């Protein structure tokens, strides 16, 4: 399919991207029309997709998209969440018309409604989830391209690109690859230099995961500021200006502090006024008497 041209052959970095994203991993079920794209079957029942056939169909789909004179006449659709961001990014890069989310029935057939469109080419992410636009495309003789898994029905699909259309990374990578090949065939970007757009921008991210990451980053920033504040706070006793002393042997003149004066009385000069050997006081006698009476 690549015409035996070296520039159109699949590079090693492309294969590594496919393997890292899990594009070659299909499902446990197999449609009879997808048997031609299967390489092997694993011991756990998962079918392995032949990436060589995936690359050939990717180039064929890119040629079909480039053949449309007006890029806006190409409609790209994804009703599933995993492909909506990729569809929007693909449309922004190639000029296609995106439909991300629910497809309104009658968009291609009902001329009365405001959302009526007449595209010349349709690209969908999942033939099973996007069955409505595929069915309407068959009514108006609209050629279709679809990312197909091992169990995807190929009814009303003209160009099937075998790949894993369930994983978020695989779907994002396939749309990124398709956008890159379209731009290369149009001459917008060169094949000699890598595309500056990263595949990560086409990946779907769960809003809950993004919120959790933002909260974790905010908490980490707060704890880091508190930690730095505790250790970087200036201590007043160490940062106070110290007096300059030319000769350290002289020392620093310490300001004199008034010392509280206490009476210097001679305790031995006091007259002896009490005899410790005298008899106990009357009060003690009374207590003794009281004790004797009680006894």
Curated annotation (Swiss-Prot):
Cellular localisation? Cell membrane; Cytoplasm; Nucleus
Q: What is its main location?
A: membrane
- MF terms (GO), sorted A to Z: laminin binding; laminin receptor activity; structural constituent of ribosome
Q: Site of the Glycyl lysine isopeptide (Lys-Gly) (interchain with G-Cter in SUMO2) crosslink? A: 89
Key word Oxidoreductase present: no
Per UniProt, the ranges with Basic and acidic residues bias are 214-227
A UniProt-annotated Pfam family: Ribosomal_S2
Swiss-Prot/TrEMBL keywords: Acetylation, Cell membrane, Cytoplasm, Isopeptide bond, Membrane, Nucleus, Phosphoprotein, Receptor, Repeat, Ribonucleoprotein, Ribosomal protein, Ubl conjugation
Cleavage, annotated site positions: 115-116, 133-134
Which residue stretches belong to region Interaction with PPP1R16B? Answer: 54-113
Disulfide pairings: none
Q: Which residues carry this modification: Phosphoserine?
A: 43
Which residue ranges have biased composition labelled Polar residues? Answer: 280-295
N-acetylserine, modified sites: 2
* Region called Disordered, residue ranges: 214-240, 263-295
> Where are residues bearing N6-acetyllysine located in the sequence?
52, 89
From the UniProt entry, list the residue stretches annotated as the region Laminin-binding: 161-180, 205-229, 242-295
PTM Phosphothreonine: list the residues.
Answer: 97
> What NCBIfam families does the database record attribute to this sequence?
uS2_euk_arch
User: What PANTHER family does its record include?
Assistant: 40S RIBOSOMAL PROTEIN SA (PTHR11489)
In the record, the note on similarity to other proteins reads: Belongs to the universal ribosomal protein uS2 family.
Q: What's in the misc comment field? A: This protein appears to have acquired a second function as a laminin receptor specifically in the vertebrate lineage.
Q: What is this protein called?
A: Small ribosomal subunit protein uS2
